[in-house]
Amino acid sequence: MSLEIVQIFINDATKAWFKTAIRNKMKINNKFRSLDDVAKICLNFKENNKKIVLCHGVFDLLHVGHIKHIEEAKKNGDVLIVSLTKDIFIKKGLNRPYFKLEERISSIAALELVDFVIESPNKTSLEVIRKIKPHYYVKGQDYKKISLDKTMEIKNEIKMVDSVKGKVIFTNSPMNSSSK
């Protein structure tokens, strides 16, 4: 799907909704936290035998494939954390990301299944994995074939998850990409 077609569907009313959500801090106050805050909160959850699930990505142009991925991820544990890549690190083409980080945070935070949303301080999720120490790190099936990983980071992510005694899970949700 081309960016022009997507822009038709993302009209001014949609953008206005996102901006209003940000201004009103709709759902963000309770869900959007710093990485360090969520890492501390996770310690308490782990002490209470709660399973921590972590997803990481851009989540620009949130679509049904993202939703199914998040639904499938949540089934693996009690607490679902979604970390987002900062705008400066996104290389998905001209005029991308379409939605700025704050808008992407609002979209993800609005999903009931998501417990916390954090921004990754770096280009990769390695620091997030190291600090959160999730029981499960969930990636989409498009990362299952490691040799096809466009980011070339999945190998490092798997090593980091192993180092914190977690498990990598690949969802079976159908692939839908907003950057293809």
Question: Where are these predicted regions, by residue range?
Answer:
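Nucleotidyltransferase catalytic core that binds NTPs
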Residues: 2-180
